[in-house]
Regions:
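C-terminal beta-strand edge segments of enzyme domains
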Residues: 88, 97-205, 209-216
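Active-site catalytic loop in hydrolytic enzyme cores
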Residues: 1-58, 62-80, 84
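Catalytic-core segment of enzymes that process non-peptidic bonds
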Residues: 1-36, 87-130
Length: 216
């Protein structure tokens, strides 16, 4: 849904006719219900939240997440978002990140740091940051997760969510690709449109009207 704009010149599936109801599939398997979101999608809590509401117990992140935002201090967004998404959705996270250094892309590098996080946000296993292939292994106790989801009263953010209070979800922000060629310049123009839209305060009535809400 969220290419790494402006540099990734791709459309979201729903820009080209995909049904939004099909964009966050969850596979029911013998080892649990598994969903997947890619790279930049993880910086948007709505993506993994939708996976959770679609039944995901394990969320897989496939990523080429680079420094200076990557898996090393002082920013370490990689760890920050992996742990946060696990805790706020009460689900396991299996996050695989590219570990590579490319001389043609200074100052960027892909620091690896693949990890497995439990449903309380605890890191169960993590690869040391750096280039090269590494294998990360940890137990994923789906039975414990299911029991915790049933038992928990406090901090059950999925059950406590007040969706009706967040009017921004009904108001378009970043404009769709449309029929124009997607390139970096076009993405930058759409970013400016999105910034203007994000500055507009949304009341419940305005948001409902923009989303095709009820008439009088």
């Amino acid at each position: 849904v969220n290419p790494w704009i402006p540099w990734e010149v791709h459309a979201s599936p729903h820009d080209v006719g995909a049904d939004p109801a099909t964009m966050f599939p969850v596979a029911q398997t013998e080892i649990g219900n598994i969903g997947c979101a890619t790279c930049y999608d993880w910086l948007f809590p709505e993506a993994t939240r939708q996976l959770a509401f679609n039944g995901a117990e394990v969320a897989v992140r496939v990523s080429a997440y680079m420094d200076p935002w990557g898996a090393t201090p002082p920013m370490d967004w990689w760890t920050l978002f992996n742990r946060t998404r696990a805790a706020e959705n009460t689900m396991f996270v299996v996050a695989a990140n590219q570990g590579a250094q490319m001389t043609g892309y200074p100052p960027f590098s892909w620091p690896g740091g693949s990890m497995i996080v439990d449903f309380d946000g605890r890191i169960l296993a993590q690869a040391d940051p750096g280039p090269g292939e590494k294998v990360v292994v940890a137990p994923i106790d789906i039975g414990a997760l299911r029991a915790e989801r049933e038992r928990r009263r406090g901090h059950d953010m999925r059950a406590h969510l007040r969706t009706e209070a967040y009017t921004y979800l009904n108001a378009p922000i970043f404009p769709p690709a449309g029929k124009t060629v997607i390139d970096i310049d076009g993405n930058n123009r759409r970013i400016q449109e999105g910034r203007r839209a994000a500055k507009k305060p949304q009341t419940p009535n305005q948001a409902g009207n923009q989303a095709g809400g009820k008439g009088g």
